[in-house]
Amino acid sequence: MKRISLTQHLIEQQRLHNKIPSELRLLIEVVGRACKSISHAVGKGALGEVLGSAGSENVQGEVQKKLDVISNEILLEANEWGGHLAAMASEEMETIHRIPNRYPKGEYLLMFDPLDGSSNIDVNVSIGTIFSVLKAPEGMTEPTEQDFMQPGTRQVAAGYAVYGPQTVLVLTTGDGVHCFTLDREMGAWVLTQKDIKIPEDTKEFAINASNQRHWFPPVKRYVDEMLAGSTGVRGKDFNMRWIASMVADVHRILNRGGIFMYPADAREPNKPGKLRLMYEANPMAFIVEQAGGAATDGTRRILDIQPEKLHQRVAVFLGSKNEVDLVTSYHQQ
């Protein structure tokens, strides 16, 4: 198989679809380089003294791991100076990060979850980085949080990296989903999967079943029907998989089908969900839809949601289309 690098792939996609201008290509390449650096830091583990808590909390009130902080800094520093961005926003930061005046400004906005699944860091389970790219509004001079308040349909690129047995980068620019594997010897992203498609039907689901007693009736009904197996109304047996790392769970679903669920529940009935719309749900929904799947919050298509605040949370149901459609229909009854 001919080896195609990330750069070559992006250039060829631009020639085919005319959707990846040079500034966007360069931005994606910079994010890719930052993910290589994060992969290197993750790979050192205890030898690099990067495990354990940083002794601080992020804007969500969550205790930060050392690698959360390191990964956030890597992404900020890598993307500040290139001239492709007007501003960045991170799950780990309270407000947006404007590009310093000493650097040229670009026309894109970058959002990221620098290290998703960080509760798994110390036990050596796959974790990852999620990112989303928006076009800055026309006529914008000094970026504000309001400039980021764009629905997911406005994303021009989205992707994630998984730091597991192999380090992979999954990317969409609106023309399918492609996967690159990091060649550690060459230090290069190499195209290893083109036009990934999620099977419409599945026998696997991912949900944190320890919260079952808190679920609302539509989720309870849906999961109970799957657990009833071949003797129940679904007429087939299902397996449950739960890694507690969204990138790892979604990557499995992308490759062999399944449904990922992180619903709202009765513990905080006034909160619409746990996952962040801008940093997690939107980029993953873009990727999943581009792979032929579906993504909703139980009632609405995630990509249609109009954000109201930077750290807005949503419920998430995504993956194989027929399963997402079914659980969504239960919420709408």
UniProtKB/Swiss-Prot annotation:
Keyword Thylakoid: no
GO cellular component: cytosol
Residues that coordinate or bind substrate: D116, G117, S118, S119, N208, K274
InterPro entries listed in its UniProt record: FBPase_C_dom (IPR044015), FBPase_class-1 (IPR000146), FBPase_N (IPR033391), FBPtase (IPR028343)
Residue positions binding Mg(2+) 2: D113, D116, E280
PANTHER family with a match to the protein in the record: FRUCTOSE-1,6-BISPHOSPHATASE-RELATED, SEDOHEPTULOSE-1,7-BISPHOSPHATASE, CHLOROPLASTIC
UniProt xrefs under NCBIfam families: PRK09293.1-1 (NF006778), PRK09293.1-3 (NF006779), PRK09293.1-4 (NF006780)
Family that this chain belongs to: Belongs to the FBPase class 1 family.
Name of this protein: Fructose-1,6-bisphosphatase class 1
Organism listed in the record: Herbaspirillum seropedicae
Organism lineage string: Bacteria, Pseudomonadati, Pseudomonadota, Betaproteobacteria, Burkholderiales
